[in-house]
Amino acid sequence: MSLVAIGINHKTATVDLREKVAFSPDKIHDAMKSLASRTRSGEAVIVSTCNRTELYCNNGDEADIIEWLEEYHGLDHKDVAPCLYNYHGQTAVKHLMRVASGLDSLILGEPQILGQVKQAFAKAKEAGTVALTIDRLFQNTFSVAKKVRTETEIGAAAVSVAFAAVSMAKHIFSSLSTTKVLLIGAGETIELVAKHLKDNGVASMVVANRTLERAQGMCEEFGATAITLAQIPDYLPKADIVISSTASPLPILGKGMVEKALKQRRHQPMLLVDIAVPRDIEPEVADLDDAFLYTVDDLHSIIEQNMASRKEAAEQAELITEEQSYLFMDWVRSLESVDSIREYRNQSMAIKDELVERALNKLAQGGDTEQVLIELANRLTNKLIHAPTQALTAASRQGDLNTLGQLRTALGLDKN
């Protein structure tokens, strides 16, 4: 039994090459079936994201798997080979556990990768490319990733601008279940902010954007309300939290607009987070009572502190993945011993059945019972001791005292 992991990621290859070796969702089902057919066990899982493509196989030949990858995507070996990494056995197990725990991610400890690995495993099960070993490997991996999350602080501290903005909001309001949020912009960063807010159970969201259609498309996903930038003055007084990230060259929220909104709110506090460059919110807003303005620079200082915290947590997480990968390999070895015992018993039973059948035939033909039984005993003894005798002879001739000692112990020769 041999586990193999072969891959390419953001550390080893350019975006251009990563795009070429990626597997589209509509083709990955057939791709896993094709890859599995190149292994002796029929087991394979493909993890393909924007930052990595990795092939996990049981009882597969490394060179054959690499050849399959190159053939599938029509790529030259010289272009792909320098960017590939490969792991075997315990190191392959540990690598998968590190990946699922976010220890190998572009952003250390990011949680999205675990969901992506789970999705890849689910697709492999649908494709029928999962059996005992791969199933146990991935189930153990998910348990390890959960253990890393619960026993370390790897995911507790925000290390992305979007996550940091929402974390700050949670810190100030303690619970977001009763807060109303106004998001300004509809780009990737605001989309991530909306996702984090939804995950944290925010009461309601309004998305303001220059292009209403773009905002509406995003709002459908997150159950938010879409408005234009011109409508912001009408919605601002209702917002407990304002998070803005647009590409506007001029500020969108001025001191006067915010001051008016605060009066309508009867001076209930308002958190404003400006993560745009150049800034979307006039810095003078910070002078207003009840307005708490934070900029992207404030978030970056938080992120830097948190990254240091995550690195400390990562050291603990590495120990967990190391320990758990060895425990998994103990299970693999126990499985191999079970297979060996089963094969040995089946072989012995086959020898016994063959010789008993031969003896019964002789008795049926009128053979002497005593003679037939003696012949059966002799033949059975010779057959069963043939392989051990050869092994003892070979070890003696080679002067391999260690193997000789193990054989003597296994055969019970050293017992008093």
UniProtKB/Swiss-Prot annotation:
The record marks 95 as: Important for activity. GO terms for biological process: protoporphyrinogen IX biosynthetic process from glutamate. It is an enzyme of class 1 (oxidoreductase). NADP(+) binds at residues 185-190. It comes from the Bacteria. Pfam families: GlutR_dimer, GlutR_N, Shikimate_DH. Keywords: NADP, Oxidoreductase, Porphyrin biosynthesis. One of its GO terms (molecular function) is NADP binding. Substrate binds at residues 49-52, 105, 110-112, 116. It catalyses: (S)-4-amino-5-oxopentanoate + tRNA(Glu) + NADP(+) = L-glutamyl-tRNA(Glu) + NADPH + H(+). Its EC number is 1.2.1.70. PROSITE patterns: GLUTR. Possesses an unusual extended V-shaped dimeric structure with each monomer consisting of three distinct domains arranged along a curved 'spinal' alpha-helix. The N-terminal catalytic domain specifically recognizes the glutamate moiety of the substrate. The second domain is the NADPH-binding domain, and the third C-terminal domain is responsible for dimerization. Catalyzes the NADPH-dependent reduction of glutamyl-tRNA(Glu) to glutamate 1-semialdehyde (GSA). Homodimer. This is Glutamyl-tRNA reductase.
